[in-house]
Structures are given as structure tokens and as C-alpha cells.
């Protein structure tokens, strides 16, 4: 009996000792990592490295991001997209919706592109910051296509008088007082038939230029419009004033510009196959896809004419617009000619109204040969067939009254400025 009790005591001691080394239900296994169910977890931040065993690697979830890219000299859109890892197929979709706007073809070094990437690393929105008050927005839709939107802040327009004397060339003298190269080009274009800028100007000749400039706060947006031009030369005074119809006249109200033509093609090719329609809807998606121009049924090789005097500012080949060109007629009017077979002028060339500038074609994305023609007033498309274009040769009596009042205001402004300068010099 005593021997049996002794053996039982030994067994009890051994069982108790083993139990001390067994893990309890509440003690985690050191070879596993788990999160209890139904417990709130902050998925935006991974657990600290102290909580995670060294043999387990955590990959953070992709997050939406914005990429700000400053365009450099020599950049191309395809090169920028490739550099940022955006497929060329996406660029094609964006260029397709940009066909009726061609904003992306006007990108310049120093301007900004903003790309918004979703949490899968795909481009969801492209924003082209054209200026501090203007931006073109391309947004990916549910079907994978892109839509276009243009946003603009009105800002404040101020009239500023730039005055100076000729010392060297007009271009150098004008930039010295604060005029930009673009403004100088507009002035010389308007006055080309009145002043020989290479021979007529002499040192000491005076100029006064009234410019309407856009500001956002105290920041100049770069958008401007020439309102009045005056040269006091040794041989006499020459001036030009912008009227409400977008054309320049001398101080007596006589036009300095030849009238516009509405049609860029011969009478035989003036059949319109698709008119201007800013509210045109896509037949499948139902989204508004504007048609910002007028399509003429032209065969390949039909002559295309400039509708007004101006300067060729764009000559380009586009995957959807085809071969196209843009003519700047003054600071208000521009015209575009798309799907051309052959372009007969060069960028920077001055052209006359009625001059043959191209041959119609079928380049780019289109269903058949035609000419797509656009008129832009202050960079906004208008219906070339209905818009109030500068086709009249003189001002009406009502127009002339308000015009002459503006001329008088300008003269008083110049006189006041000269008096102020004279006081400063005494």
C-alpha cells in the first residue's frame, strides 16, 4: 500500500512539470502572424517592423498620385508619356478627343502637364495648364474613352499704355518698354502696309501702344490684346485702332485690313457636309462631342485659300487632324484648315487673303475627303457661316460714333502720360 502511494506521487509531479511548459490558448505561436477577426485595422499604414517577423514581407497597396511635369525644349507628348509609363494607346485616345480643340498641339516649353493616376497606376485625368487662368482637362470615362473640358478663370482685364522712342529697331525698342515678342509681331502685322519697319523708322521717332492685359491678382496671365497703335514719325503720324468688329481702322474710321472671306474654297466645292455644332452628341455614348468647324465636300487636290491676310503660325501633321495649318490674322482672329493633302506655305510666312495655301485631302481620321475649316475669335471657335466676321469695308454710323470716342480717349491718355513724363524729368 505504501509503495503504491509513492508511485502515484511521482506521476503527479511529472504531469505538473510538463504542464508548466505547454503553451496556453491565449499565448500566440511565435512562428505565425495574424490579425484577429472583426478588429479594426488601419490599412493605410502597414504594421511596424517590430510587430512583423523578419521572414514576412508586406507590400503596401498602390495609392492614387499626381504627377506634375514641366515641359522642356525638345519634349514630345509621346516621349513624355513613355517616360512616365503611360501607354501610347492612352495618348491616342486623348488625341482623338482633342481633335476638335487641338489644345495639346500648342504646348510650349515651360508649361505644365498634370497627370492623375488611380490606385491601379492607370491615367485617370490629364490636365494641361495653358496659363494660370486656363486649363484643358481630359478625363477617363467608364468605357475607357476620354472626355474634354475647358476651364477658365475670368481674371481682371487692365489697359496699359506702353510708350517709348525708337533706339535701334522697333522690336528692340518695344521690348525695352515691356512689350512681348508676340505683341510686337501683332503690331508689325497690323501696320505692315503703313510702315516699312526696316526703313521708315528713325532714332527719336515715338510710339504709343495701348494693350489690354489679363491679370489674376497681381500676376500677368500672358493673355493680351492690342487696342491702339500710334507712331509719330518724322514724315507724319500713323495710327491704328481696334474696333468692336475685331478689325483695325485708322483714326478716321477707314479700314486698315482687307475684308475676310467666309469660304476657303472655290464655289464648286462649297457643299457643307457637316456644319458647326458645339452641342453635337456622340450617337453611342450620348456625351457632348462638339464639331467646332465647317466641313466642305472637297476632292483630293482641290485648292484651299486663306480667308484673310495673316501669318502662318502652325504647320503640323496630327494623327487625327491630318496635315493642318493655322493662320493668325490679328490679335482677335485665327483660322484653321484640317485634313490637307499638301501644305504650300511655311510656318512664319505672311499670306494674303485669297492666296492658295494648301490642297485639300483625306489625311488623319475621317470618313472621306473633305476640308475642315475653323474660325476662332479670341481663341474660341465660332460658326464661320453665321458669325459677325469683319467682312464690311467701313464702320456703320453707330459704330463710328463709339469708335471715334475711343480714339479721343486714347489721345487724352497719351497726352496725360507725356505730361507726367515731362514732370518727372524736371
Curated annotation (Swiss-Prot):
Record's compositionally biased regions (Polar residues): 32-48
Activity regulation details: Not inhibited by metal chelator EDTA.
Record's signal peptide: 1-21
UniProt GO MF annotations: metal ion binding; metalloendopeptidase activity; peptidoglycan binding
EC number: 3.4.24.-
Cofactor: record remark: Binds 1 zinc ion per subunit.
GO CC annotation terms, alphabetical: periplasmic space; plasma membrane
Major location category of this protein: periplasm
Deletion consequences: Grows as wild-type in LB medium. Simultaneous deletion of shyA results in significant growth defect in minimal medium, but no growth or shape defect in LB medium. ShyAB double mutant does not grow in minimal medium treated with TPEN (N,N,N',N'-tetrakis(2-pyridylmethyl)ethylenediamine), a cell-permeable metal chelator with high affinity for zinc, and cells appear aberrantly thick and long. ShyB shyC double deletion mutant has no growth or shape defect in LB medium.
Sites where the protein binds Zn(2+): 291, 295, 372
Induction and repression of expression: Induced by TPEN (N,N,N',N'-tetrakis(2-pyridylmethyl)ethylenediamine), a cell-permeable metal chelator with high affinity for zinc (at protein level). No expression under standard laboratory conditions (LB medium), but is expressed in minimal medium. Expression is induced by zinc starvation. Transcription is repressed by Zur in high zinc availability conditions.
Cofactor(s) it depends on: Zn(2+)
Pathway(s): Cell wall degradation; peptidoglycan degradation
Positions of the UniProt region annotated as Disordered: 32-55
Keywords: Cell wall biogenesis/degradation, Hydrolase, Metal-binding, Metalloprotease, Periplasm, Protease, Signal, Zinc
One Pfam family named in its UniProt record: Peptidase_M23
Record's subcellular location: Periplasm
Keyword GTP-binding: no
Enzyme class: hydrolase
Domain of life (superkingdom): Bacteria
Subunit structure: Monomer.
Free-text function comment from the UniProt entry: Cell wall peptidoglycan (PG) DD-endopeptidase, which may act as a substitute for other zinc-dependent PG endopeptidases (ShyA and ShyC) during zinc starvation. Hydrolyzes peptide cross-links which covalently connect adjacent PG strands probably to allow insertion of new glycans and thus cell wall expansion. Degrades purified whole PG sacculi in vitro. It is unclear how it is able to function in low zinc environments, but that may possibly be due to binding zinc with very high affinity, utilizing an alternative metal cofactor or that it may function independently of a bound metal cofactor.
Assigned protein family: Belongs to the peptidase M23B family.
Protein name per Swiss-Prot or TrEMBL: Peptidoglycan DD-endopeptidase ShyB
Protein species of origin: Vibrio cholerae serotype O1 (strain ATCC 39315 / El Tor Inaba N16961)
